[in-house]
A protein has these predicted regions:
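Acidic, metal/ion-coordinating pockets
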Residues: 1-133
Length: 133
């Protein structure tokens, strides 16, 4: 619920732990997102999305980044405007207890690659696309 989410966000902030995907409100998301981390001169933009909240309503004013191509495209454009060298889109998606990703995941994966960023937090059988020029 809202109280648990706010507690978690407050705790992470107090410990200096960077986070993305859940926000206190729209202003919080606008200020913090995309999450840009710079290490050894490399600027990494982290994007984070989920398929849903397991049927639970997200109480206002909390924001959870849901998988939505239009929003993701806007976020990738924002990351590019921040001069990110690398864009990683962490996707909480897929079906449990299956060894191959469903077609909708394959299609979204291909679209993400075409947009410039792709990573997944779930190991499944997958194919690589060589993106080097």
């Amino acid at each position: 619920g809202k109280g648990t989410a706010i507690y978690t966000l407050d705790m992470m902030d107090s410990l200096g732990i960077a986070h993305c995907g859940v926000y206190r409100n729209k202003e919080d998301r606008n200020r913090r997102y995309p999450l840009l981390i710079e290490k050894k001169g490399v600027r990494i933009a982290l994007l984070n999305y989920t398929y849903g909240t397991n049927g639970r309503e997200v109480p206002a004013p909390l924001i959870v980044n849901l998988i939505d191509k239009e929003s993701i495209a806007e976020d990738i454009a924002d990351a590019k405007c921040m001069n990110a060298d690398v864009i990683i889109a962490c996707m909480h998606w897929g079906d449990e207890y299956v060894s191959l990703p469903p077609q909708r995941i394959k299609e979204l994966s291909r679209w993400l690659i075409e947009q410039g960023g792709f990573s997944t937090n779930d190991l499944s059988n997958f194919r690589f696309k060589n993106l080097s020029n």
